[in-house]
Amino acid sequence: MRLFLSLPVLVVVLAMVLEGPAPAQAAPEISSTLERIPDKLKEFGNTLENKARAAIESIKQSDLPAKTRNWFSETFNKVKEQLKTTFS
């Protein structure tokens, strides 16, 4: 009984696959795709620029750079003092 039902389903699926894509799903022409490449690249560049600017502004406004700088300064001074006391 299962084989009797699965064969027609298999035939219908095979027919749909062999039919190919519908006209609305067909790939666009190469020339139209090539014409849109500069616009897409410009849009990508603008988006990337905006995101980079936003990230840089976020970093500038955060306390992370100042905290990092202070930590490095403190650590460097501690190491310098330890070296002075060790080799003096």
From Swiss-Prot:
GO biological process: lipid transport; lipoprotein metabolic process; negative regulation of cholesterol transport; negative regulation of lipid catabolic process; negative regulation of very-low-density lipoprotein particle clearance; triglyceride metabolic process; very-low-density lipoprotein particle clearance
GO MF, one annotated term: fatty acid binding
Entry's localization field: Secreted
Pfam families (alphabetical): ApoC-I
Main location: secreted
Coiled coil: none
Keyword vocabulary terms for this entry: Lipid transport, Secreted, Signal, Transport, VLDL
Stretch forming the signal peptide: 1-26
Keyword Glycoprotein: no
Family: Belongs to the apolipoprotein C1 family.
Name of this chain's protein: Apolipoprotein C-I
The organism of origin for this protein: Arctocephalus gazella (Antarctic fur seal)
Gene expressing this chain: APOC1
